[in-house]
From Swiss-Prot:
PANTHER family to which the protein is assigned, alphabetical: INNER MEMBRANE PROTEIN YEIH-RELATED, UPF0324 INNER MEMBRANE PROTEIN YEIH
Name of this protein: UPF0324 membrane protein NMA0465
Locations listed in the record: Cell membrane
Pfam families to which the protein is assigned, alphabetical: Cons_hypoth698
Keywords: Cell membrane, Membrane, Transmembrane, Transmembrane helix
Membrane association type: Multi-pass membrane protein
Record flagged with keyword Transmembrane helix: yes
InterPro entries per record: UPF0324_pro (IPR018383), UPF0324_YeiH-like (IPR004630)
Transmembrane residue ranges: 5-23, 33-55, 62-84, 94-116, 123-145, 155-177, 222-239, 254-273, 280-302, 312-334
Lineage top rank: taxon: Bacteria
Gene Ontology CC terms, in alphabetical order: plasma membrane
Amino acid sequence: MNTRPFYFGLIFIAIIAILANYLGNTDFSHHYHISALIIAILLGMAIGNTIYPQFSTQVEKGVLFAKGALLRTGIVLYGFRLTFGDIADVGLNAVVTDAIMLISTFFFTVLLGIRYLKMDKQLVYLTGAGCSICGAAAVMAAESVTKAESHKVSVAIAIVVIFGTLAIFTYPLFYTWSQDLINAHQFGIYVGSSVHEVAQVYAIGENIDPIVANTAVISKMIRVMMLAPFLLMLSWLLTRSDGVSENTSHKITIPWFAVLFIGVAIFNSFDLLPKELVKLFVEIDSFLLISSMAALGLTTHASAIKKAGLKPFVLGILTYLWLVVGGFLVNYGISKLI
């Protein structure tokens, strides 16, 4: 068995990931809140649509491994970023709000994309995952369940990046208008429950107020913790949509990496490991996710994205409006009830 394409592929991916990580830590990237994850996929796409086809057979096995197994490992290790103590800091209000926003956003996206826009189901599911939970990381995690093609994943990530970036500029303006209706703590929960990416949530909070920033990040982390049960629900939903008779028992494919993700978060809550070791796991996790993003970019072709047309961006715009307007109404209502 020729193992060269595997190891050469991993080395190639590692080089791109290291470069993306370096660029993601520059002052320019910090100023414009451009994460290493986004840089990795952009680098991957740039290389993948230019010189990569000339030597793809020499590295393909390693690239595919990075896109699959390394991604799942990264999702599992993501649990070391969270503890259940985070939930107690923001209370029941944030938990209920996050759950309602996750479910409503996903099914709003699915209904709109599949029934009215007649879009590809896998693309709609990926977009719904990214908009309702934690952006690009959720899209990539959902890809492992849906088995979607690379160009569909890239389109979904593009939607998350574009409209999440738009949120960085619009939410601070909305805060000025909404101060008479909700306080800084409540607005933080609103940001955390409705903005796509963790980095975008932090950027918005920092641009407004420390209270907003802290509450928003914790609220967002609660949404991230809902990733595993969401993936289980998505797996069940995909099984139901396969056209199997209702009288037939359905075999639900369990994404075990999602179950392990919950297990790691629970374990991390007991604070049994030295902080230095947990920090190391988080750093390894970041590198694995960056690597899988690079692999995704390499296997994405611009021509395939063009074929998607305008419908994905129409879906992105309407979902963004739901997150901003519907999200505010949900948060305002919950704040009055709880």
